[in-house]
């Protein structure tokens, strides 16, 4: 995601998401505005959003400065992650795994000290282009490192969009028993067509929480030839068809996505419905 969108547009999208029944929204990232100008308005957004008892607004962070900004905004839920592949991790954060893990350790401690829920994750869990995938056993060893921090949730991200349903099942077969009931979130990208099958495979394994974005917008500016997260409206449709009640109005989502597409005058939105 390289285009910078206005705060007004983001708040318009937020209103549509709330009207459709979405109850957990990652508003932005507290990262350096010169590196990611798309997120320069994070404070503005957190101060502008309507507050509801049943709505969670979270933020992505990478370091203690970002967490400090989140604390100042009254954020009660944050997400952070580190890359399993140092070629990507260094481009994204300027840190190799060991240093990033030390930073994550401090973040978890500080977040809990301030009564903030924190989700920790592994980027590139299913590999990156032109490098061999690490495999489920190796990924499990890194999951153990995350579990040692006692986070509130664990996330596995297919940052490069390379996972297949078979690979998803292979990973989850050994990871789910190991995390002992710790909530697991999956973060997929629709880099290749048919990727919703990955979410379907995870649903069959019992996973119920996935990252998504309206219309499939997004994607890492540090990863070449990737797309955004799965479109929220497509994920909700899949769950509806599986008999899983999300409490989200799919038609309301589609209406908001269509309005966003007209506003942007862009073909960037990738939802299938």
Locate predicted features:
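Catalytic cores and adjacent flexible loops of soluble metabolic enzymes
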Residues: 1-273
């Amino acid at each position: 995601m390289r285009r910078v969108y206005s705060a007004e547009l983001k708040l318009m999208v937020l209103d549509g998401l709330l009207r459709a029944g979405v109850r957990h929204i990652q508003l932005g990232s507290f990262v350096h505005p010169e590196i990611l100008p798309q997120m320069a308005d994070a404070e503005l957004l957190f101060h502008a959003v309507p507050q509801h008892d049943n709505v969670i607004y979270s933020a992505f962070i990478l370091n203690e400065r970002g967490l400090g900004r989140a604390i100042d905004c009254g954020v009660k839920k944050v997400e952070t992650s580190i890359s399993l592949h140092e070629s990507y991790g260094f481009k994204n954060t300027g840190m190799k795994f060991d240093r990033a893990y030390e930073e994550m350790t401090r973040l978890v401690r500080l977040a809990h000290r301030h009564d903030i829920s924190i989700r920790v994750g592994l980027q590139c869990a299913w590999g990156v282009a032109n490098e061999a995938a690490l495999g489920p056993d190796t990924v499990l060893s890194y999951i153990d490192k995350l579990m040692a921090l006692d986070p509130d949730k664990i996330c596995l991200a297919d940052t490069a969009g390379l996972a297949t349903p078979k690979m998803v099942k292979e990973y989850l077969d050994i990871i789910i028993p190991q995390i002992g009931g710790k909530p697991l979130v999956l973060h997929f990208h629709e880099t290749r067509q048919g990727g919703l099958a990955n979410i379907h495979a995870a649903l069959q394994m019992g996973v119920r929480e996935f990252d998504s974005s309206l219309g499939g917008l997004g994607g890492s500016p540090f990863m070449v030839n990737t797309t955004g997260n799965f479109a929220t409206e497509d994920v909700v449709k899949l769950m509806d068809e599986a008999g899983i009640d999300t409490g989200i109005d799919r038609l309301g989502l589609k209406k908001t996505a269509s309005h966003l597409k007209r506003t942007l005058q862009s073909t960037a939105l990738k939802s299938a419905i």
